[in-house]
């Protein structure tokens, strides 16, 4: 028996029905097989830039930006021999012939996707085993393939793994993981939140609803890891994932379509009308001025509706400007207007609006250190909302028309070209719906 009575219809990014009458728990990270596979692959996958390694060795550009070591140039036809290198890497990484190690060449051998076996993940204390094992395997594979001597072997290591272990991260490396090193996390359990918005956008190939869905899946799954989505709060996070992330009951699509020529204010008007119609909220009292105070029939469901409206308002507002910079102020003032309109708390009970205040300052106010695309849920500025703000940032970067200094192409080219090859990363909405369909009758 399901723990919750909620049942939802799941719609695609095109507004078409995918699966109906789905128990809410069928989209839970603890139950949905697609989300389980996605999280597993996030942890065990590594993108290796063979073309980058070849170029670094050829120019002796080792260890990061502006680092050149004249006289240490090494010319190796790495991309030309990508298949042989990939085969060697597979033999080094796998633990048995029939395990789930996966090696995939991408872009004619310029990149490799390496997925280490779950047996290695199972005996490791954290997820960095994937990067460390893959890095070591690639180094050895190149040395063996080209018979590199002991004097140039360290150059190969640096071209692959960067300055590590001089640094705690892989500065200057030609391998990338979606999850950053645990030592750089803002708090315990923040690993899945440590994926910048631009990476999410690149993986989903700038499809707005799929990008916000992937962001929501990662953010809300992290809530189960941090203990936020336990007990009384679990349903709130599941509803948020379903409605804001997965377009449950087509609410997100309907709000955007209805306000295609509207504003943040018209989205709020549509949302309140829909919430009243669906009996999520009701009038609690009416003042002499005619102003109506509302109360929710269901606090968790109201938060899910409000969060969906927030994402819709972001899509409408940023979509009109084709400039992502407005996402912070949209998140802020959507909540401000919504609270004045209804007398109800905003998204995430105030945390989304609070996050947006700092986000506005650090993304484009007098500080302006970085554009919206480089932020993530592990950032000291944007960590405070419990999974409801970052999907808006991902959506905004999908709609940006090239206004950003930190563009998706600049920050996330390798990540996008590699991870977008995995279908449930690229199109999470339809694949999570398939996973829900598999298990809905078993709950």
UniProtKB/Swiss-Prot annotation:
Catalytic activity: coenzyme B + methyl-coenzyme M = methane + coenzyme M-coenzyme B heterodisulfide
Molecular function in Gene Ontology: coenzyme-B sulfoethylthiotransferase activity
Cofactor: coenzyme F430
Cofactor note: Binds 2 coenzyme F430 non-covalently per MCR complex. Coenzyme F430 is a yellow nickel porphinoid. Methyl-coenzyme-M reductase is activated when the enzyme-bound coenzyme F430 is reduced to the Ni(I) oxidation state.
Name of the top EC class for this enzyme: transferase
Top-rank taxon: Archaea
Sorted UniProt keywords: Methanogenesis, Transferase
Entry-linked Gene3D superfamilies: 3.30.70.470, Methyl-coenzyme M reductase, alpha/beta subunit, C-terminal (1.20.840.10)
Pfam families in UniProt: MCR_beta, MCR_beta_N
InterPro entries: Me_CoM_Rdtase_asu/bsu_C (IPR008924), Me_CoM_Rdtase_asu_N_sub2 (IPR015823), Me_CoM_Rdtase_bsu (IPR003179), Me_CoM_Rdtase_bsu_C (IPR022679), Me_CoM_Rdtase_bsu_N (IPR022680), Me_CoM_Rdtase_Fd-like_fold (IPR009024)
Function: Component of the methyl-coenzyme M reductase (MCR) I that catalyzes the reductive cleavage of methyl-coenzyme M (CoM-S-CH3 or 2-(methylthio)ethanesulfonate) using coenzyme B (CoB or 7-mercaptoheptanoylthreonine phosphate) as reductant which results in the production of methane and the mixed heterodisulfide of CoB and CoM (CoM-S-S-CoB). This is the final step in methanogenesis.
Summary of subunit composition and partner proteins: MCR is a hexamer of two alpha, two beta, and two gamma chains, forming a dimer of heterotrimers.
Stated name of the protein: Methyl-coenzyme M reductase II subunit beta
Lineage, broadest ranks: Archaea, Methanobacteriati, Methanobacteriota, Methanomada group, Methanobacteria
